[in-house]
């Protein structure tokens, strides 16, 4: 009888839902397991095979944990705010709410069709009022505690999307959303003071189990450095230019300074500057460039020497010129840098172009040809001369700066405060009122959620204002503090807001009194295992850890870190080995695979196709191979015999497979776990039969990968009503995982001359004797003297001969 996968899959998906077999139980006496996958953005295109791979890893772990007796929380939801939905609404006139609901329904149907064991009673939707009420609530807590603030600054602005972008959302000078060029624009911006948590974010990495490359990317993103702040005085002006450097030991080599074109000192002393026209012209050119364009290392150096501003090197008293240049940004460091052209490539190129002195202070290179960026003996450096240990030189200089009152040791971070507002409609309204008398005032907590008003036109204003700014009934309000006329904030939060705490809401998704009950958080948190894409290990992972640590400081969550473990899956490439894209026509639709082969085949294939953590191309022939695997499992019914224990011929194979599959699932080696099951299947067919005890174990081992066919066989063959409810994960006996015999190679003078099957615990003496007695080997020993005998236990015998 052929396996009717369409009927079986529909049947078991309905049965699981009716039985509530995947529902997590709060505060159970069982050990808990909280497995988390990144909730999807519900796009109109629906799910792609990348979603399937991303969710299938922890799907297998979660099903295994349930069979091991754990109380499992494996939830799903929808990160549904975002520009693509709003852009679609602008294009079609369909309200984002309606679009979002349609897309969520589509995703839900697709996820259920694949048979994922999510707890569907805990679904969250970031656009639902009961959810974003608490997103706004957390924002107000940050505002109360000084972590949410507003500042006028140059921002990355996308003229196409008409929205302000964070540095993270505009990498490479391109908009993350529409990929058009980003420009600089002066604007009031909401920030979250994530830099206040930089050290806590770094320290927390020592307490969690993240993949090494994930941990390193977070460390690099935060970018903590140690160095010194140094004050450079200005000639005839009562001001200092304060800089930060990681190499204070090179101060004697400073021959010029560079400040950002936006530095306030320029306008403050404009009357003393003799070339303001040239400076203003240069500043106008800089304003047209994105931050990415300005800070590229490989580009022509441009700048203007400021006529009227001269700095003084604090360690040798030499007067040095001050330039403006686009590669210095006000938002990074202090907006001013010291330049040591002999030992910095960018400073060297700048000095060469503008004819500035280059003074060697570290011996080791040829500064006539290039900057020397290595270590060496200090020269031309006064009290540092002769030192050849960088650490000692830096420490000595910091002591000197501190003693003279011209600087001090310090720390800087590459990570900047998080630009947190967007000029769009489809996002969480920022619950702040602007009052001419009281300033910025929080919307009272009992008035949350501050709801999005109904609008007919979602187009942003031509000046980059939010569509909300055009709705007088929303904008005009009373100040919650004084009762006077006021105006609401019209910017909305970025998509990152809702995803920064969703894992907490899963714990208690229907609570209208708090974002989650503390006792439930204490039971379920931290997340035991979080899997997601490598593209989110900096922005999302850092943002959500920041929100969580803030809530921890308020005593609202019970543990220091939200995620105990974080892993990542590799991409599924197109059949051509290139990243899937509509333009290349190499996109695989998971619905088509399910319709043609069944959900179990799709689930098995995405985990069998290669190393889970690495990219792998789609292969239709391998999909068919997984279909044969499922069919062979089904056809075991044709050779089924009675038996309540493993047969002698298959006992060792079963114990080994249980061990292998159990261990491989825990280490992301899903492909080798499936390969082990395929090998066991071959052993069974070679034996010509399988008994009921053996098939029971096999069905349980296969179930996390292919739950539908295993449930159908479990029920049909009378093992029980439902495998997911009745079964327990099998154990193995370590002693029965050891082979009684092994195959060893026999070499003569290093060349393979034969193979032997011997006892696994054979002694060296007996192994060598057996090798010499082998007929094939003896022909290579005739008339030869054996001068050396080597036995590598369990591997080989090598006989070295002469003659």
PLM features per residue range, with description:
Residues 1-36, 66-75, 99-106, 282-324, ...:
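Conserved oxyanion/phosphate-binding beta-strand-loop segments in alpha/beta enzyme cores
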Residues 79, 144-160, 250, 409-438, ...:
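Helix-rich, typically C-terminal accessory recognition domains appended to large enzymatic cores
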Residues 25-94, 100, 123-138, 245-246, ...:
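N-terminal catalytic cores of NTP/NDP-binding nucleotidyl/phosphoryl-transfer enzymes
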Residues 2, 11, 15-19, 91-241, ...:
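Residue patterns forming the tRNA-binding/recognition surfaces of aminoacyl-tRNA synthetases
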Residues 38-47, 119-124, 329-337, 379-383, ...:
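Glycine- and acidic
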């Amino acid at each position: 009888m052929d396996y009717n996968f369409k009927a079986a899959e529909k049947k078991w998906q309905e049965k699981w839902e009716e039985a509530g077999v995947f529902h997590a139980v709060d505060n159970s006496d069982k050990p808990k397991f909280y497995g988390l996958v990144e909730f999807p953005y519900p796009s109109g295109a629906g799910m792609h095979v990348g979603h399937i791979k991303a969710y299938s890893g922890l799907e297998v772990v979660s099903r295994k944990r349930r069979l091991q007796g754990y109380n499992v929380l494996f939830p799903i939801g929808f990160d549904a705010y975002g520009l693509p939905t709003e852009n679609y609404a602008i294009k079609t006139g369909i309200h984002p709410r309606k679009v979002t609901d349609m897309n969520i329904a589509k995703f839900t149907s697709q996820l259920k069709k694949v048979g994922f064991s999510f707890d569907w009673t805990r679904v969250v939707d970031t656009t639902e009022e009961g959810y974003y009420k608490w997103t706004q609530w957390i924002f107000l807590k940050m505002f109360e505690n000084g972590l949410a603030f507003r500042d006028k600054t140059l921002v990355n602005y996308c003229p196409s999307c008409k929205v302000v972008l964070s540095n993270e959302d505009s990498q490479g000078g391109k908009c993350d959303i529409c990929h058009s060029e980003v420009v600089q624009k002066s604007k009031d911006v909401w920030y979250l003071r994530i830099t206040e948590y930089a050290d806590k974010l770094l320290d927390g990495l020592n307490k969690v189990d993240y993949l090494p490359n994930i941990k390193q990317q977070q460390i690099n993103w935060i970018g903590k450095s140690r160095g010194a702040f140094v004050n450079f005085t200005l000639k005839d002006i009562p001001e200092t230019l304060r800089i930060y450097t990681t190499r204070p030991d090179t101060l004697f080599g400073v021959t010029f300074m560079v400040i950002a074109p936006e530095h306030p000192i320029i306008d403050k002393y404009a009357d003393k500057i003799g070339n303001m026209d040239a400076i203003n012209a240069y500043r106008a050119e800089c304003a047209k460039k994105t931050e990415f364009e300005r800070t590229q290392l490989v580009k022509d150096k441009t700048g203007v020497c400021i006529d009227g501003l001269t700095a003084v090197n604090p360690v040798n008293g030499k007067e040095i010129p001050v330039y403006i240049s686009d590669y210095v940004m006000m938002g990074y460091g202090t907006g001013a840098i010291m330049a040591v052209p002999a030992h910095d490539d960018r400073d060297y190129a700048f000095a060469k172009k503008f004819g500035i002195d280059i003074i060697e202070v570290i011996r080791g290179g040829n500064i006539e040809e290039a900057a020397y960026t290595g270590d060496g003996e200090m020269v031309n450096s006064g009290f540092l001369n002769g030192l050849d240990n960088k650490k000692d030189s830096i420490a000595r200089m910091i002591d000197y700066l501190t003693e003279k009152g011209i600087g001090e040791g310090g720390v800087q971070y590459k990570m900047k405060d998080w630009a947190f507002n967007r000029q769009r409609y489809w996002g969480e309204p920022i619950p702040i009122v602007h009052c001419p008398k009281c300033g910025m005032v929080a919307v009272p907590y009992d008035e949350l959620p501050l709801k999005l008003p109904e609008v007919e036109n979602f187009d942003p204003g031509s000046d980059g204002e939010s569509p909300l700014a055009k709705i007088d009934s929303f904008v005009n309000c009373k100040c919650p503090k004084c009762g006077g006329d006021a105006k609401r904030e019209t910017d909305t939060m970025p998509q990152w807001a809702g995803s920064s705490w969703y894992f907490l809401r899963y714990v208690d998704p229907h609570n209208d009194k708090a974002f989650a009950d503390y006792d439930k958080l204490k039971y379920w948190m931290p997340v035991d295992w979080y899997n997601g894409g490598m593209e989110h290990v900096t922005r999302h992972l850092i943002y959500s850890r920041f929100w969580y640590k803030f809530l921890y400081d308020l005593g609202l969550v019970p543990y220091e870190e939200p995620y105990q473990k974080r892993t990542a899956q590799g991409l599924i490439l197109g059949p051509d080995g290139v990243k899937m894209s509509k333009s290349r026509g190499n996109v695989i639709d998971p619905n088509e695979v399910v319709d043609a082969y069944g959900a179990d085949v799709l689930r098995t294939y995405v985990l069998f196709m290669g190393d889970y953590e690495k990219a792998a191309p789609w292969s239709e022939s391998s999909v068919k191979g997984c279909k044969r695997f499922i069919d062979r499992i089904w056809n075991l019914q044709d050779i089924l015999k009675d038996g309540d224990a493993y047969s002698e011929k298959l006992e060792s194979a079963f114990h080994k497979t249980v061990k292998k599959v159990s261990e491989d699932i825990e280490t992301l080696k899903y492909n080798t776990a499936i390969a082990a099951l395929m090998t066991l299947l071959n052993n069974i067919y070679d034996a010509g039969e399988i008994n009921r005890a053996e098939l029971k174990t096999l069905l349980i081992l296969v179930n996390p990968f292919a739950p539908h066919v295993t449930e159908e066989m479990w029920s049909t063959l009378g093992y029980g009503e439902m495998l997911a409810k009745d079964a327990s994960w099998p154990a193995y006996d370590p002693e029965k995982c050891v082979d009684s015999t092994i195959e060893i190679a026999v070499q003569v003078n290093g060349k393979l001359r034969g193979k032997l099957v011997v006892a696994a615990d054979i002694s060296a003496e007996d192994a060598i004797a057996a090798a010499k007695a082998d007929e094939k080997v003896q022909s290579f020993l005739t008339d030869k003297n054996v001068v050396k005998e080597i036995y590598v236990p369990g591997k080989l015998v090598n006989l070295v001969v002469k003659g």
